[in-house]
Amino acid sequence: ARLVHLAGLCGRNVAISSATIPPDLAEGLYRSYQAGLKSYNSFFTGKKQCALVLCDEFRTDVEPMDSGADSAYRKIHDRFIRKRVENLGKEPVKRRGYIQFCGAEDNDTDAAKETSYFENIREAIEKLHENHHVIDKRTKKRISFGVVRVANITPCVKVSLYLMKCGWSEGTAVRVMTYHSRQILLLRHEQERYLDKVFTRKTQSATVDFQDETVRKHLDSTPEENIIFILVATPVEEVGRDHDFDWAVVEPSSYRSIIQLAGRVLR
C-alpha cells in the first residue's frame, strides 16, 4: 500500500496483475493510490485524473474515477467480477480436483503418519498419471509431467527422497526433481532456465514427439512403459512461472495457493 501511495504521489501509473487478489485488498490499494494522487494534484495546476482499468481474457473496462469515489469503485469492481464469473461459467471445464484421503490413525507414531502421508501422495500421482498422460510418438510409452506442491522446504526434500526410493507399480518409472528457494543461486538459475524450457508446452495433441535431449534420453533408455516426471516444489512454483503440467498434487496453504497452482495445469 505504501508503494502504491508513493506511485500516486509521484503521478505514476500502477498495474496490478494477480489471479487471487481479494476485492478488499484491491479496494485498499485503490484508496492508497487515490490518496497519493490527491497529494500530487495539490502541487500542480494541471490535474491528473485517475482512470480505473479492469481487464481479463474476456473484456476490458475503463472508467474515469473522481477522488473519494470509493463506493463507485466497489460497484464497478463487483459488476466486473459478476460478468467474469458469468463468462467463466460458459467455458468448458479444463481442471477438476478431488481430495485425497489420508488414512493415518491418531495413535500412529509421527514416522508412521509421515510415511502414510507420503504414500498417499504416491498413490495420487499414479492415479493422475493414469488419467492424464500423453503418448510418446517414437516409443509409444505413456508419459506425464506433474508437480507436487508442499508448503515447506524440509518436507519438500523428504517427499522427493521418498518418491525416489519407494516402490511403484510394475511397469512404472519416475524421475524426480526438487525445486525450492534454498537452492544455491547459480544452480537454481540453471534449474529454472531448464524448467522454463521443458514446461513451456503449447501442443494439445495426445501424442507428442518429445525433442528435449535430457527427456529424450530418459524415454529411450527406460524399459518401463509408464514414465512419470515429477517436480516436487514449494510455493516458489506458484508465482511468475509459465509452466504447464499435466496434473498436480497440492498440499495447500490456502484457497489462493490452490488457485495459483491450478493455473500451472493445462495452461
Segments and roles (model prediction):
Residues 1-6:
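SF2 helicase catalytic motif II
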Residues 10-13, 172-174, 244-246, 256:
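Short glycine-/polar-rich loops that comprise or flank the Walker A/P-loop
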Residues 251:
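A Lys-centered signature of the CheY-like receiver
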Residues 215-221, 231-245, 263:
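SF2 helicase motor core recognition
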Residues 38, 100-231:
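Conserved C-terminal RecA-like helicase domain
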Residues 12-16, 21-30, 36-154:
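Conserved interdomain linker/interface between the two RecA-like ATPase lobes of SF2 helicase motors
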Residues 20-23, 152-155, 183-185, 237-239, ...:
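Conserved nucleotide-binding/hydrolysis micro-motifs of P-loop NTPases
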Residues 255-267:
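Conserved SF2 helicase motif VI
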